[in-house]
Each structure stands twice: as C-alpha cells, then as structure tokens.
UniProtKB/Swiss-Prot annotation:
Function: Component of the protein machinery at the inhibitory synapses, probably acting as a scaffold. Inhibitory synapses dampen neuronal activity through postsynaptic hyperpolarization. This synaptic inhibition is fundamental for the functioning of the central nervous system, shaping and orchestrating the flow of information through neuronal networks to generate a precise neural code.
Subcellular location: Postsynaptic density
Coiled-coil features, chain-numbered ranges: 30-63
Gene that produces this protein: Insyn1
Keyword Coiled coil part of the UniProt annotation: yes
Protein's name in the database: Inhibitory synaptic factor 1
Alphabetized PANTHER family for the sequence: INHIBITORY SYNAPTIC FACTOR 1, PTHR15917
Organism, as annotated: Rattus norvegicus
C-alpha cells in the first residue's frame, strides 16, 4: 500500500504484515530515544559533580596568594582569581590585555643583547680593538689551559702531550705563547714507535746485530782455551734474520739472553711472545722420562 492507502500495483497488499512492521520500528525508535535521554541525564549529573568539585577547589585555594611577578611568562600573571570569578567576568578564556612590550619583560633580553655587544669585537674601520685587561670575561680552556681573555684564540695543547696531563703552572708564572704555535710532544721515539707500529721486528734485528757486533771482540779472549786453529764464528753471525736469532736464543750467552728478553712496558704482546725463551728442554725431558 502507498501513503494514501491505495493498494500498490507492484507488490501484493498485506495489511496486517505492514502494520506489524511499523509497530516494531516505532518501538525501536522509542527505545533508542529513551537510551539517549538516559545518557543526557547521566551527563547532567556528571556536570553537577564537576561544578561541586570546582567549588570545593575554590574554597580550599582561597587562602593561597597566586600573585606573581609581572615578568613571568605565565597566564597566571593576568589575575589571581579563581575559575568561577573568571567565568563571571568575561568568560573562561578572557585573559585580558597582555602587553609583552613592557620594560619589565624586556629587561633581561636587553641586558643579554648588551652583553653580546660588549663581548663581540667591534666592526669599526680601524680594526678589532686589543683586549683590555679586566674588561672582557676570562674563558677557561677545556684541555687544562690557562684563562685567556676574550675567547679561545690561542690553541690548546695537544691531548696526547704531557702538558695536558701535567699540573697547572704557578699563579705567578704565565707562559708566553704566540697564537698558532703548539707545544712539542715530549714522548720519546721508542714509545712513539711502539705505539704506532705493532710490528717491530726490524728494530729487534738491528738491536741483535748491534749486540753481536759489541760482543765480537770479547770472543777471541775465550778462544785460546779451545784451540788455536778453530776460527771465530763472530764474522758469520753479523748478517742473520731476526727469526733465526730468536730460535737460537737458548744457545746464546747469558748477557745476550738478558738483552734479548728485555722487560719493557712499551712492547706489544706479540713482541713479548716471540722474544721469550720457550721451555723446549722441559718437553724433551718429559719425553725422555716417558721412554
């Protein structure tokens, strides 16, 4: 059926079925409206509770004095009244007239700008002025340097030098150093060599050759006891690789073994492991004992 009650030609007319569907739709709409009304009532109750909480907060904080300095950058500087008084005056968002160009607010910024003008060099035609004693701030350098007026224009000592780790000089002694110069590193060549080069076999070979050359004139003094015709082996040991000299370490003289197996804190781990005399005799004795 259509709106006027006439039967619809396209659909068969069922009066009881169509009336039941309308009733069901009306009931659902009433149920939804009732739920919405209940939600509105609950929201009104929540609003009342919030108003009571706000009034209690106002009563508790009425004894507090919230007046702040005028140069504080907060919205609380406008007024120290409660939220209810603000709502009655001009709405909850009425902050009044904020004048940010007052002298009290800009006092700190102008002082900072004047400090920058004093600390920076002038851009005059005559050139930068010489630093006057007592006027510019003294900047303490970071690597143990001395207080130098008007910024770090003198280079600091190198962090690897001994000057950076040594104690500061006396108050009366001020080192005269020109800009651009650096302190010479006081590390010895041997320490610097072992720190930069982990493979120091060439230096060991030269030291062993120097030791053999130094001990060469002492060997003929011992030779007359063995025989006059036996040639001295000193000239044949002058040219020898570092590996062979290390393998023949147990057969060297006690003075040579002391010099070869020197104890130095600057040697690398590989250098010490190759220069120490390994206990080959102990393993041979164990093998003989087992046989």
């Amino acid at each position: 059926m259509n709106i006027r009650g006439a039967p619809d030609l396209g659909q068969p007319s069922d009066d009881p079925n169509s009336g039941g569907e309308r009733e069901r739709i009306r009931q659902r709409m009433k149920m939804v409206i009732g739920q919405l009304e209940g939600i509105l009532r609950e929201l009104k109750e929540v609003a009342k509770e919030l108003r009571e909480v706000v009034s209690q907060i106002d009563k508790l904080t009425s004894d507090f004095d919230f007046e702040l300095e005028p140069d504080d950058w907060t919205t609380a500087t406008v007024s120290s009244t409660s939220s209810s008084d603000k709502a009655g005056a001009g709405g909850p968002f009425d902050l009044g007239h904020l004048d940010f160009m007052t002298a009290d607010i800009l006092s700190d910024s102008w002082e900072f700008c004047s400090f920058l003008d004093v600390s920076t060099p002038s851009d005059s035609v005559d050139g930068p002025e010489a630093p006057r004693p007592g006027t510019g701030p003294d900047y303490q350098l970071m690597n143990g340097g001395l207080p130098i007026p008007n910024g770090p224009r003198v280079e600091t000592p190198d962090s690897s030098s001994e000057e950076a780790f040594s104690a500061g000089p006396a108050k009366g002694q001020v080192p005269q150093r020109t800009p651009g110069t650096r302190e010479r590193v006081r590390f010895s060549d041997k320490v610097l060599y072992h720190a930069l080069c982990c493979d120091d076999e060439e230096g060991d070979g030269e030291e062993v050759e120097e030791e053999e050359a130094g001990l060469a004139p002492e060997l003929p003094r011992v030779e007359p006891h063995t025989g006059p015709l036996k040639p001295s082996p000193a000239p044949y040991k002058t040219k020898r690789s570092p590996l062979t000299t290390r393998r023949l370490g147990p057969t060297l003289a006690p003075e040579q073994t002391r010099r070869v197996t020197r104890n130095s804190s600057t040697q690398t781990v590989s250098d010490k492991s190759t220069q120490t005399v390994l206990p080959y005799t102990a393993t041979k004795q164990k093998a003989k004992g087992k046989n």
